[in-house]
Each structure stands twice: as C-alpha cells, then as structure tokens.
C-alpha cells in the first residue's frame, strides 16, 4: 500500500498570539509546521508529502523547502484546502494521512497505527478517551452534567483510502469539523486507534511551552 500525507498549513488563526499564524511561530529547532512536516517526511512508510499553504504564504520564506515536499495552494475553507492537497496525490498513492500542521508533537507510533489500520479499513484516526467530568453551562453557571461514556478527543493524522476521501470531500464540501466527519457523512466507517496525550493541537499561547518541552525531551535535551 502506497501512503502519502497532506499537511494542512493554510489557516490564519492567531489566537495563539505572536501576530502571525501559529504554524509559522518558532518552536524547538524550527517552526510549528516544520516539526509536523518532518514527522512525515522522515517516516519510512510515507511516499509523498503535500504541504497546503495559504496563497499569501507560497512566495514567502515562511515554509521550509524540504526535499521532495509538494506544495498546494489552499482554498477559501479548510475542506477546500484539504481537497487541493488530496488532488496533488491523485494517482500517486493508495492511502493518505491528513494532518493539522498545528500538531507538531505527533509520534511515529500514532502514524504507524493509523497506517496499519488502513490495511484493513477504509478510514482510521487517533483519539483519546475523555476522562474529565463534563458540564453544560450558560452565562457563567453550571447547568448540568454530561455523560462522558463513549466520548473521545479527536486527533490527527486522520487516514483514508485516497479515492474514498476525495469522493467524500467532493460530495460534502462544507461545514464539517474534520475529515472524519466528512468521511462519515459519505458512509465510511472510521476505526479509532489510540491517540497520544502529547499530540496536542497548538491553540493558545501556553501550548508553545508544552510543545517545546515535549520535543526537547524527545531529543534528550
């Protein structure tokens, strides 16, 4: 099975601070996006890696010119950006892993598990079971509790057979929270593989320090 990856780095989110999109903020030995890219370009089972960029970023020095990296121009929505990346792999791979560039601490084990699941399933994605108590609330007040049984925190990379996820994105181009939702709308069954607590999505300013500590620990310093 030939496997490719699409790394989505076309967002403009600045909630994490710094005045520039979070994927281009400095982290460890490069940037947030660079750490994500290297997790896939350095993986033995991944054949082609596509980096989806915002059109304004393509002609800048923000993104790393990694050997063999394929660049795609993102669209007006996340779904359009993903589809642009998927099209770059059409005819090259059998399966694809779609990853948020803002998850720079993804592990080889998580990538391995998603690929392994795709050998027998059309779709697979990592997740971590919810263990905290869940409340509902309104106007700063607790209004109730929610049963956490069967609830998971979704992560990436989310993996699919390439033809199936391209068809799904064409059928359902808007409004999905992630690619698993797109796949399920199209009738695909999605296998859950174990996620990793370290596979955080950088969203808020404090997330950078945590990600830095994780990556430094892996390097042994």
From Swiss-Prot:
Transition state stabilizer (site feature) positions: 15, 22
Pathway note: Isoprenoid biosynthesis; isopentenyl diphosphate biosynthesis via DXP pathway; isopentenyl diphosphate from 1-deoxy-D-xylulose 5-phosphate: step 2/6
Catalytic activity annotation: 2-C-methyl-D-erythritol 4-phosphate + CTP + H(+) = 4-CDP-2-C-methyl-D-erythritol + diphosphate
Residue(s) at site: Positions MEP for the nucleophilic attack: 148, 201
Enzyme class: transferase
Gene3D superfamilies linked: Spore Coat Polysaccharide Biosynthesis Protein SpsA, Chain A
GO terms for MF: 2-C-methyl-D-erythritol 4-phosphate cytidylyltransferase activity
One record GO biological process: isopentenyl diphosphate biosynthetic process, methylerythritol 4-phosphate pathway
Pfam family, one: IspD
Keywords, sorted A to Z: Isoprene biosynthesis, Nucleotidyltransferase, Transferase
Keyword presence, Nucleotidyltransferase: yes
InterPro entries (UniProt xref): IspD (IPR001228), IspD/TarI (IPR034683), IspD/TarI_cytidylyltransf_bact (IPR050088), ISPD_synthase_CS (IPR018294), Nucleotide-diphossugar_trans (IPR029044)
The protein's Enzyme Commission number: 2.7.7.60
Source organism, top-level taxon: Bacteria
Function recorded in the entry: Catalyzes the formation of 4-diphosphocytidyl-2-C-methyl-D-erythritol from CTP and 2-C-methyl-D-erythritol 4-phosphate (MEP).
Family in the record: Belongs to the IspD/TarI cytidylyltransferase family. IspD subfamily.
Official protein name in the record: 2-C-methyl-D-erythritol 4-phosphate cytidylyltransferase
Organism field: Roseobacter denitrificans (strain ATCC 33942 / OCh 114) (Erythrobacter sp. (strain OCh 114))
Gene name for this UniProt entry: ispD
